[in-house]
Amino acid sequence: MPWIQLKLNTTGANAEELSDALMEAGAVSITFQDTHDTPVFEPLPGETRLWGDTDVIGLFDAETDMKDVVAILEQHPLLGAGFAHKIEQLEDKDWEREWMDNFHPMRFGERLWICPSWRDIPDENAVNVMLDPGLAFGTGTHPTTSLCLQWLDGLDLNGKTVIDFGCGSGILAIAALKLGAAKAIGIDIDPQAIQASRDNAERNGVSDRLELYLPKDQPEAMKADVVVANILAGPLRELAPLISVLPVEGGLLGLSGILASQAESICDAYAELFTLDPVVEKEEWCRITGRKK
């Protein structure tokens, strides 16, 4: 069915209050969008991550009298008479089908493909990870995930143990297992991420080789041949003492979730214990890799 969309711009601090106002005026759903397309990473459980400059979009039934809606909103103290807004008629579409059509199999490196379940596998002889978009976790579309997948694809992981620190969807741990790792360990602070990783591992037939832990439950003295952490620069810097002890001597470390402008400070945090490779950049993001001394 067709819909009517009303969009208004506000600050992150006021966005949720105005979303309530739109719902009270008859909106059936609310969407928050960043006006400047700033990337958002995995929010904490229960957190709504908003931006400084936020578009609040209310979706209304096509039969709604939008003059009445605007009149109601003009009474709100954050808006007032003549508040800036945009009303748009949305054509009738199969929105679920359109959403699905936006996701295609993606290749990383020489062997690895990430494929949505509703798409045909492009190469039956390749290493194929079946992963559907859903929860707010990595599916390979973000440059940092892509950088990590390409790195893993280029390693000889046969018989190795891999730790995915901040596992999210489990995409990196599952890819490592499909690429030949004997065992993978996923760690995340979010119980939803642990569940998403478990579900995705079962879908890919590797759940028997994947261990998943919240930080409070992870084994002491845990070690791995390869450690990958695709989180953010702040946690990578703060957790450097913890992450640095995870690789065995001579083991490999891969870090991403880092803006190119942050690379130097992250390198400084790990240089004492690792021989670091040249930084690899993709768009505005980068990957830092090295070997444990």
Curated annotation (Swiss-Prot):
Transmembrane segments: none annotated. Its EC number is 2.1.1.-. The keyword S-adenosyl-L-methionine applies. It is found in: Cytoplasm. Keywords: Cytoplasm, Methyltransferase, S-adenosyl-L-methionine, Transferase. The keyword Cell cycle does not apply. GO terms for biological process: methylation. Pfam families: PrmA. GO terms for cellular component: cytosol. S-adenosyl-L-methionine binds at residues 145, 166, 188, 230. It catalyses: L-lysyl-[protein] + 3 S-adenosyl-L-methionine = N(6),N(6),N(6)-trimethyl-L-lysyl-[protein] + 3 S-adenosyl-L-homocysteine + 3 H(+). SUPFAM superfamilies: S-adenosyl-L-methionine-dependent methyltransferases. One of its GO terms (molecular function) is protein-lysine N-methyltransferase activity. Methylates ribosomal protein L11. Belongs to the methyltransferase superfamily. PrmA family. This is Ribosomal protein L11 methyltransferase. It comes from Salmonella newport (strain SL254).
